[in-house]
UniProtKB/Swiss-Prot annotation:
Keyword Transmembrane listed: yes
Known function: Regulates metabolic homeostasis in response to nutritional cues and may therefore be involved in adaptation to dietary variations. May not function in creating mitochondrial proton leaks across the inner mitochondrial membrane (i.e. mitochondrial uncoupling).
Entry protein name: Mitochondrial uncoupling protein Bmcp
Molecular-function GO term, any one: transmembrane transporter activity
Keywords for this protein: Membrane, Mitochondrion, Mitochondrion inner membrane, Repeat, Transmembrane, Transmembrane helix, Transport
GO biological process: regulation of metabolic process; sensory perception of sound
Amino acid sequence: MGEVKDWRPFVYGGVASITAEFGTFPIDTTKTRLQIQGQKIDQSFSQLRYRGMTDAFVKISREEGLRALYSGIWPAVLRQATYGTIKFGTYYTLKKLANERGLLINEDGSERVWSNILCAAAAGAISSAIANPTDVLKVRMQVHGKGQHKGLLGCFGEIYKYEGVRGLWRGVGPTAQRAVVIASVELPVYDFCKLQLMNAFGDHVGNHFISSFIASLGSAIASTPIDVIRTRLMNQRPVSITMNGVVTAAATPKLYSGSLDCAVQTIRNEGLPALYKGFIPTWVRMGPWNIIFFITYEQLKKY
């Protein structure tokens, strides 16, 4: 019977991820807008339009409509269908393999932290690299909002036309790094907290809620600087050039040459705190996202 259930962590992870994405996506949109603003070397996003998460939420809703908060939701759903399914399925599969080889459980019955971290890091890196194109589409659509893009297929066509297949893999390095950091912190911390709280709360919703909240704070602190770099790299595109009234595009963007260059220029031009732009919406979103995800996941496991 155990063999039959091997596919279930993958399906449960995907369904729970998509459910959580729908519930928290507007917060993610405000985070993306905050992270790309204030880039002094990019005139399109040099202005500080939003003072914070609440201001961004209000202005986007008022100026672009409530639907703009869900710009990019479909590539986000596609991302979770791949990223979420592969990440959580791979994580729990690797844990099972580690357990079978005696690498997971200590003599006192507790789980080994290093084993959990390695399983989570591997799962995060693999899944994020595979899902990177959907992440690029999501960021592009979030930045421009409703009415300024042609939808999922239109955005895909524009990237392919002007940037080629490589355009869909912009930011794959920091994306994988971010996924490794989040997975290495979030999943082991959740499992650790859940185990520690088992005597007080049992394997119930209260335990899942508290464990999710603690896990989200740690992952937000660790991952936000990488997330800022990732978002900026994904959003950069060929610079528009007008010649004889015809708009063309340069062969390559000249804003950032890579992750390190983006980090250096961001700190130099905007200061070190710029790497934590969007931290509040990141944490505010991670909390509910993890709570929705893990509660959904735990409930699905019962069937």
